[in-house]
Every structure is written in structure tokens, then in C-alpha cells.
A protein has these predicted regions:
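Accessory, solvent-exposed terminal regions and/or long lumenal/extracellular loops of proteins
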Residues: 182-265
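Catalytic-domain carbohydrate-binding cleft regions of carbohydrate-active enzymes
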Residues: 1-182, 187-188
Length: 265
């Protein structure tokens, strides 16, 4: 895992193919492990990609007497911070995906072919992925990029996270403008994305009291959220919380919540 644009790019098919091979929890060393320090642009893009990996770790054994750390590029510290905070906000969604992986083997970072086997175009797409089931990610992986081409799989609509949830039909390639702050994401039609509030800064001692739900309604769809204390094995004796959200789209969008388990935190 060398600090290079090639490594950044090919980490995507490496991780998604390991997911297809029964290894759902994977991640690459952010910024590269061995070699010289990454450039500022490369490191920012690597963090923006790494926040979607099951294993997010910034560490290195550089051969130029540097140590890769989030604060090494002060000019981009806000971009790095914002990306990491976004990962924290995704904690409820990610933890539920981890639970699903433990039960079914479904990867956290999914190759598009995992969910869209009837779309022949996704068999040629190696550099996009699904984060969990419902978020398509097309990270910026080319140096100096000003635009990013994105293929949206056929069979459903997609909503652009960064463009006021602009709706696109699936089965087409679009080209979007990007800046250094861009983390291109598209929400799958029918999704319910649970996010923590902006105050969650660490998973040790911090607890979110509010969930923000992003809903892309389609017909009647069921989504499951899972939570427990994240530390003990008490979940084996029922100390967990599994919440089922049933969303029905019509003239109005209705949401029904049912839950099981005794975890209350």
C-alpha cells in the first residue's frame, strides 16, 4: 500500500473483491503505509475514500522520517476533519451494516455487481462501490480532477447527495463537477439512511440522542437498524435494539417503527 494515486484507485477493487470473496471487513492504510509522505491532495482524497471502509486507520511506516497524520496538512485540515466527522455521522448506518455482515456476509463496501447483477454495465465498473446497500460512492481518484464520471446502475433512481438530492434515472453515466471538498454520493431509491447528529465526535463515551433519517421513498420498503453497547457480549442475552422501519410512499410518506430487544441507551 504505497502513497500513490494508483494505490488509492486500486484499493477500491481490492476491497470490493475481497468482499465478494467472503471478507466483509476490510480497509487500506489511509495515505499509504510504506514510502514517502503523501501529497496534500492525495491524502485528502484518501481520507475521503477511507471513511467508507470498515477499517479506517491512518498510520504509516514512511521511509522519509515522516509520520502520516491528519494534522500534517494544515491547509486542508478542515476537509480532513469534515470527512472524518461524516464517518461518525454515518455510525448508525455503518453499525447496522456491520451487524448485517455478521449475519449474512454482505460486505460493507460492495462491488456494484453484488446488488445489480442484471445490469451488464456494472461488470465493467471497478472504481465505484456501494457503502452498505443504499449509498453509491464515486470518490475522486484522479490527481487534479475537476469532474467525475459516475455510472448509475439500472433498475432504480438515484439521488445526488451533494446537489440538493437531484434525482437521476439509473442506467446512465453522468459527469459531475468536483472540488477538493467533493465526496460524490448517490442515495438509492427506497433507502432510509440513519445518521447521528453533528455532536458525535468519538465512539468512546459519546452517545447520540437523535437520529436523522434521510428518506428516498419508493413503494413500501423495510429497513432495519441495529444497536447495542458495542463493548460487551450482552447482546447474546437480548441486550440489543433492532428497529424495523417500514416506509410507504404515496401522497404522503408514512413511516412505522417497531423494535425488539432490551437495549435502551
Amino acid at each position: 500500500n504505497y502513497p500513490s494515486w494508483k494505490s488509492l484507485k486500486y484499493n477500491i477493487p481490492l476491497i470490493t473483491r475481497m468482499g465478494l470473496s467472503g471478507q466483509p471487513n476490510e480497509g487500506a492504510d489511509i495515505g499509504g503505509f510504506a514510502g514517502p509522505a503523501p501529497t496534500e491532495e492525495l491524502f485528502v482524497r484518501w481520507v475521503q475514500q477511507g471513511i467508507f471502509q470498515a477499517r479506517f486507520s491512518i498510520h504509516s511506516a514512511s521511509n522519509d522520517n515522516t509520520v502520516t497524520e491528519p494534522w500534517m496538512f494544515r491547509g486542508s485540515a478542515d476537509l480532513i476533519r469534515d470527512a472524518i466527522l461524516l464517518r461518525y455521522r454515518f455510525t448508525p448506518y455503518l453499525y447496522s451494516a456491520e451487524y448485517n455482515a455478521s449475519k449474512t456476509g454482505a460486505p460493507i463496501m460492495r462491488a456494484l455487481v453484488y446488488d445489480f447483477q442484471d445490469d451488464p454495465n456494472v461488470y465493467e465498473e471497478s472504481f465505484e462501490f456501494l457503502f452498505g446497500r443504499d449509498i453509491l460512492v464515486a470518490n475522486v481518484i484522479e490527481e487534479g480532477a475537476k469532474t467525475r464520471k459516475v455510472y448509475l446502475p439500472a433498475g432504480c433512481k438515484w439521488y445526488d447527495w451533494s446537489d440538493k438530492m437531484r434525482c437521476y434515472e439509473g442506467g446512465q453515466t453522468i459527469e459531475i463537477p468536483v472540488t477538493m471538498a467533493s465526496i460524490p454520493m448517490f442515495i438509492r431509491e427506497g433507502a432510509v439512511i440513519a445518521m447521528a447528529d453533528n455532536q458525535l465526535m468519538t465512539m468512546e463515551g459519546d452517545h447520540t440522542t437523535d437520529l436523522h433519517l434521510i428518506v428516498a421513498p419508493k413503494g413500501t420498503v423495510t429497513t432495519t437498524l441495529y444497536d447495542d453497547d458495542g463493548v460487551t457480549n450482552d447482546f447474546k442475552s437480548g441486550v440489543f435494539r433492532k428497529t424495523t422501519i417500514t416506509t410507504t410512499a404515496g401522497e404522503r410518506v408514512t413511516m412505522d417503527f417497531t423494535s425488539e430487544g432490551s437495549y435502551e441507551d
